[in-house]
Structures are given as C-alpha cells and as structure tokens.
Amino acid sequence: MLHRMPKSYRTPSGSVYTPFLEMAERPHLLIAGATGSGKSVALNGIIHSLLMTQSPHRVQFVLIDPKKVELAQYEYLPHTMKYASEHPDIVRALQWAVDETDRRFSLMQDLRVKEYSGPHLYVIIDELADLMVSIKKETLPLLQRLAQIGRAARVHVIACSQNILAQTIPTPLKCNFSTILGLRTANAQQSRFLISTTGCEMLPDPKREGKGYGFLRDGADLEKIWIYKYPEEETEAAISWWCSSACIAAM
C-alpha cells in the first residue's frame, strides 16, 4: 500500500503493533495537543514513512515551517517543492499549492478523468496557530480551498497545532480534516473541540509518563493509539540518501 503514515499502539500483551493509515483514503490530517505531547514525533514519523517508501515521482512536499526548526532538515530533499518559514514566503508557497491543485484539475478535465494519477502532494504545516494568528487573512482562504478540493487532485493537508482554540483552528477549516489525531490536552473542553468527546485531557502526562499517546478520530471511529518514534539517525540516513548526487543521478 502506498502513502502510509505510521500508527502504533500497545496491545494487551504489552507488545507494540504498527499498522498503517492509508493517507490516500484519508486526505487531510490534523495533529493537535499540548506542548511536548508528541506532535513532532507524529509529524516526523509521517515524513519518515514516506521517505522510506516513496520517490519524488510519487510524493512531493510543500513544507510550512513558521518556527524554522521542525521541518528545516527536509528543505533540500528532491521531494520538496517549496519550503517556507517567513510569512511572505508561506503565503507564496500556499498559493503555489493552490495553483498546482488548479493545474491538476485542468489536466483532469482535458483528459476526461475524475482523479489525478500523478504524485501525491503533501502540504505539511508545523504550526497552524501561527498562521491563524499572524496571517490568517492571507492563508485561511488558501488552506480552505486546498482542504475542500484537494482530494481528487492528490493534494493532502497535514497540519499541527499546540493552540487548541476555535480562533486558531477555525471550525470551517477543521471540518475538512477527515482525520484528527488528538494528543494530550490541557482540559476536557479542548478534547471535545478536537475529537468530539473527552479523553485527551486524561492521557499520560508526557513529562512524567511518556509521549505519543493519543486518540485518533477517523470519521465516526475513535481509537486510542501510541505513536512510534523513529530513531533520528534513521531519518537522517534517509535524508542523506535522497540528497546524495548518486541517488538522484540513478533515479
């Protein structure tokens, strides 16, 4: 299966089982939780999984990194079409993604097909709240368009947020996220906003009991999960391999 994200959880026996989510069937994903709850682990796990299985001919990235830290290591991958960390560049990168989506739909119309057959494009946002606080007027319409029409064009939005409020995750945008990964939250109200029920506030404290526990809301289904953390050296090795001139020349 292609375009998968890692999802792990502990079984009653204590072992770790790692199935996968088919991202092509769940086009958009929101990851939210308090600081230190495991958002970065989940996000890097998704990217790692794609790098280990997909070439730039199959998967492309638009990386939105307002904190300038989490996604910087992926900037020079051959998969990366756009990397943006400054607000003007972020707006331009999102506009490029919208234009690319429109281009794909025009091509589909010309070919009389209902679904795009080219590379999947992942628009990955490390901190959605930063965009909604600082440049909401410019970015919200672009994100809504991507989330509303991206699926048939193989355009996926994956967004992280540690600020769990309606002002920073607008409801019209949130409604387009078919899958939500709710990590530990500060209170029950935030949990209900994320996954439509309480529970995230009672997840293990990441400072004392471990990171990466969460609830996965996938349509009507709700599942308690644990996110697997890939060793950093494995991710670094994958990045190095893809960025090597020998690898690119052999593609």
Model-derived segments and spans:
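P-loop NTPase catalytic phosphate-binding loop
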Residues: 1-114, 118-207, 211, 215-216, ...
